[in-house]
Amino acid sequence: MAVLSRIMKPYRAFQRLPFELKPLAILIGIAGSTAIFTMGYKIYSDPEIRRSPSWVAQTQQKEETKVKKPQFH
């Protein structure tokens, strides 16, 4: 039950807001979410910031650099 009460806490706080402030709270929430997603996208897409190769490139590089062990018959 503790998890459910944590999840419901922001909703209950929103319910207690006066009716006049609810549109402002919604607008602030949407703007904050948009800012977070935009920054995440910019950080992920900028090659200067994101220098590590992708998972696919790492896997391909490992396959190419594997040293084959000699097989003795």
From Swiss-Prot:
Residue stretches spanning the membrane: 21-43
InterPro entries associated with the record: B12D
BP-aspect Gene Ontology terms: mitochondrial cytochrome c oxidase assembly
A GO CC annotation given for this chain: membrane
Membrane topology category: Single-pass membrane protein
Residue ranges of the region described as Disordered: 54-73
Main localization category: membrane
Keyword vocabulary terms for this entry: Membrane, Transmembrane, Transmembrane helix
One Pfam family cited in the UniProt record for this chain: B12D
Compartment(s): Membrane
Keyword Transmembrane part of the UniProt annotation: yes
Protein name per the record: Uncharacterized protein PB8E5.10
Source organism of the structure: Schizosaccharomyces pombe (strain 972 / ATCC 24843) (Fission yeast)
